[in-house]
């Protein structure tokens, strides 16, 4: 059994947490996030700690408590420090350009791709082949990065495509005659 739910979430200075029924709102210097808590889980605040516990000992309750604790921890970390994902475009003519609330991608197709950046995410392009996504919602930052990567996943023969900075692409050898 995992013991994740038993560890409290430490709330840093500058972050305020509001509990109202099954809803939790976390405000910090970077932004504000809110979430509805599962009905099997009860969340309480003691000084600068958030404690998750179960309502009744039913199957899967501790699993939900552990998930809730991890989600709250990500919310607290997101509004205090923020999250960041970096993507690299590798291939001849592959380019990216941030234009307001959209990202213009040239990925070898016959047409350019305009990807809309969701609210709460900032997109920067330090160079034509690098994309940096920042935000306070870990799920939204990761999902946006995954959506951009899905346009042209890295292929195993030449390694062309959109990849994460720390991603390792297994290479294959070309067919021999």
Swiss-Prot record:
**UniProt similarity note:** Belongs to the universal ribosomal protein uL6 family.
Which keywords are on file for this protein? Ribonucleoprotein, Ribosomal protein, RNA-binding, rRNA-binding
Q: List the disulfide bonds.
A: none
The gene is rplF
Source organism of this protein record? Colwellia psychrerythraea (strain 34H / ATCC BAA-681)
Summarize the protein's role: This protein binds to the 23S rRNA, and is important in its secondary structure. It is located near the subunit interface in the base of the L7/L12 stalk, and near the tRNA binding site of the peptidyltransferase center.
Q: Which PANTHER family match?
A: 60S/50S RIBOSOMAL PROTEIN L6/L9, LARGE RIBOSOMAL SUBUNIT PROTEIN UL6M
Record-linked PROSITE patterns: RIBOSOMAL_L6_1
Known partners and oligomeric status: Part of the 50S ribosomal subunit.
Tell me one GO molecular function of this protein. Answer: structural constituent of ribosome
What is the protein name given in its UniProt record? Large ribosomal subunit protein uL6
Q: Which Pfam families match?
A: Ribosomal_L6 (PF00347)
Q: Which InterPro entries match?
A: Ribosomal_uL6-like, Ribosomal_uL6-like_a/b-dom_sf, Ribosomal_uL6_a/b-dom, Ribosomal_uL6_bac-type, Ribosomal_uL6_CS
BP GO annotations: cytoplasmic translation
- Point out the signal peptide segment: none
List GO terms (cellular component aspect).
Answer: cytosolic large ribosomal subunit
Keyword Membrane found: no
């Amino acid at each position: 059994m995992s013991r994740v739910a038993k560890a409290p979430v430490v709330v840093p200075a500058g972050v305020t947490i509001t509990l109202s029924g099954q809803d939790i709102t976390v405000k910090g210097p970077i932004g504000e996030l809110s979430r509805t808590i599962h009905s099997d889980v009860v969340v309480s605040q003691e000084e600068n700690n958030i404690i998750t516990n179960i309502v009744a000992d039913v199957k899967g309750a501790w699993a939900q408590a552990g998930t809730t604790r991890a989600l709250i921890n990500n919310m607290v970390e997101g509004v205090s420090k923020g999250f960041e994902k970096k993507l690299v475009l590798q291939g001849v003519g592959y380019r990216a350009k941030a234009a307001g609330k959209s990202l213009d991608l040239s990925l070898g197709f016959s047409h350019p791709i305009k990807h809309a950046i969701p609210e709460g995410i900032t997109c920067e392009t330090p160079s034509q082949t690098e994309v940096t996504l920042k935000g306070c919602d870990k799920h939204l930052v990761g999902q946006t990065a995954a959506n951009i990567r899905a346009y042209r996943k890295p292929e195993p023969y030449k390694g062309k495509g959109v990849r994460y900075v720390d991603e390792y692409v297994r290479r294959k050898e070309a067919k021999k005659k």
